[in-house]
Amino acid sequence: MLSKNLYSNKRLLTSTNTLVRFASTRSTGVENSGAGPTSFKTMKVIDPQHSDKPNVLILGSGWGAISFLKHIDTKKYNVSIISPRSYFLFTPLLPSAPVGTVDEKSIIEPIVNFALKKKGNVTYYEAEATSINPDRNTVTIKSLSAVSQLYQPENHLGLHQAEPAEIKYDYLISAVGAEPNTFGIPGVTDYGHFLKEIPNSLEIRRTFAANLEKANLLPKGDPERRRLLSIVVVGGGPTGVEAAGELQDYVHQDLRKFLPALAEEVQIHLVEALPIVLNMFEKKLSSYAQSHLENTSIKVHLRTAVAKVEEKQLLAKTKHEDGKITEETIPYGTLIWATGNKARPVITDLFKKIPEQNSSKRGLAVNDFLQVKGSNNIFAIGDNAFAGLPPTAQVAHQEAEYLAKNFDKMAQIPNFQKNLSSRKDKIDLLFEENNFKPFKYNDLGALAYLGSERAIATIRSGKRTFYTGGGLMTFYLWRILYLSMILSARSRLKVFFDWIKLAFFKRDFFKGL
């Protein structure tokens, strides 16, 4: 694990001369301006130990952050990463994890494994960024994570769990992603499970497993038994549909073998506010997906919005084609919330500090070169950037690849950093003057697993479509393409063997509970 390696070795050297370390901290007595969420009289400022090259600070460890790290030339920059999560998560397969189709450990890759492949200086801080301070070119970190404290009680940064510090940067890459959006609906946070991180997957498994055990002790026909065996998935996008499909696979393929009576009573509900599921696909594929879900006993609620969530039931309102609105109460034992994103607090805080971002809502507004509008040296990629593109992994990956190539070119232009930092307006013209091409997104299509070894897919590049269809063969195509998308050979091999194991054995659903 990255954190354990780093804490046991302050400096971890490899034959490729990569340096992965925690930077030392010194107190400079710098007065905090109070720009962050909390004001401190003095704050420790972490100075980069290598000043021979520009310092690039990456926030996050998701698709944008790790893809940028993979492609930037670390011989030209000193690169630092801040993230409370010490690993990259392959999010497209996260819906497969709660029921044990793939192991959670198979879809994560420690940051150190990416960093050690780079030449140059790579520094990782296992901490949460709470404030970006563009006036000082620093990022405030709230504390080291609990993992850091666990592995190194006497951490050499000299920070206590709640003590802040500031890290300096020359360039900042904001790639913190987004957090789930509950749209202000009461009860979602209290009673629902999100599906965005590994802990969410474990929580869903624990809840469903506990409900199965409780329901097994109740007589058939008991209303409480029916409630415990009711699963509601809110969100008809890829995450929600794939989560519902994976749950139904577990019920039909595994639970039916050792608890057949319970399996017959499990009811999965899929709730979607739009008139159709998977609306990013063409209509015939979305219709195929809906028919398949319903044929596998998943109850699909379309044009249905959740109005309120209570401990054991939710209130939903359905708007029919004739405009009539009806209300229904859906009892549930497990509620999965898989719809909507919103900006994280560190990003909404930055909205207030840059006048050009004051009206931003969904993410940081960026120009054609992914530079945050109103800033000289802050760039944003992925879900925390707003460029009119869908919040998908392929968008973040392409943005990161593009930006890393731009940074390599920037390093070759004399005085580029100096000229960029001195610009007061029309900042993007500097990129145009030096013949930088604007970012252009290449839509490669979309994939979605439906359950029962069926999937739908649209494969394209630009305006040319190579494949569109659904069914068993598309399921195998889905698997092949997902394997190819995994960023490390290690994770790719582990996922492949998880699928091989699934063909011969049941899922490891109750492991670690």
From Swiss-Prot:
* Residue numbers binding FAD: 55-85
> What stretch of residues directs this protein to its organelle as a transit peptide?
1-26
Matching entries from InterPro entries are given as:
FAD/NAD-bd_sf, FAD/NAD-binding_dom, NDH-2, NDH2-like_C
For this record, an example GO cellular component is: mitochondrial inner membrane
Q: Which cofactor does it need?
A: FAD
Protein origin, superkingdom: Eukaryota
Q: Where does NAD(+) bind?
A: 229-265
Entry's Gene Ontology BP terms: mitochondrial electron transport, NADH to ubiquinone; positive regulation of apoptotic process
Where is the protein found, in the record's own terms? Mitochondrion inner membrane
First and last residue of the signal peptide: none
Report how it sits in the membrane. Peripheral membrane protein
- What GO molecular function terms would the record report? identical protein binding; NADH dehydrogenase (ubiquinone) activity; NADH:ubiquinone reductase (non-electrogenic) activity; oxidoreductase activity
Coiled coil residues, start to end:
none
The miscellaneous comment for this protein is: Present with 5240 molecules/cell in log phase SD medium.
Protein purpose: Catalyzes the oxidation of NADH generated inside the Mitochondrion.
User: Into which family does the record put it?
Assistant: Belongs to the NADH dehydrogenase family.
- Put simply, this protein is called Rotenone-insensitive NADH-ubiquinone oxidoreductase, mitochondrial
